[in-house]
Amino acid sequence: HRYKEDIALFAEMGFKVLRLSISWSRIFPRGDEERPNEKGLQFYDDVFKELKKYHIEPLVTISHYDFPLYLVKEYGGFKSRKMVDFYKKYATVLFKRYKGIVHYWLTFNEINDTLILPYLSAGVVIDPNEDKEQQLYNAAHHILLASAWAVKIGHEIDPTNKIGNMFAGGTWYPYTCHPQDVFATITKNRDAFFFCDVQARGYY
């Protein structure tokens, strides 16, 4: 409710781009509704109008650690492939609503955190009776699939859209020269960078 003051101060400092995130739950409170919540969309309409007044370009994150709780409880978050369709519907609403208003999009915040912070990043609660790695990599696959669909849909709606995602960068180094440490480092780096590889190459 203080965003107008914040944006005015932001403009006073001379910034030209503001990264902000749209709350999935504001647009689809449960996540599986047929129609979006108009009041939620109106809130962001007003935010973007305020940014335009100050000639500030919005850089919008579609999903930033913020999933409708119902989707987590009912479907297990991105462990379920059904989440891809829920995300597609949500992203499509945003791309259509803000065509010509938002030109820069991030599909997911720190997409590779799916393997590190599964509940926060993918709405996944690990089932102790199932293989943990399998659950994590299934969720990662579904998130990458959802992201790819968003890029496709976003460009179909507005070919001028620039769409990517946020990656939690970092490099692992071996503790010693021992082969086990070196191999562990390779594995850790692979787990992080394969998220970029898939999106750049289009395959695993």
PLM regions and their residue ranges:
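Non-catalytic scaffold segments within catalytic domains of secreted glycoside hydrolases
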Residues: 1-2, 7, 11-16, 28-204
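Short, histidine-centered active-site or binding-site loop motifs used for metal coordination
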Residues: 24-26
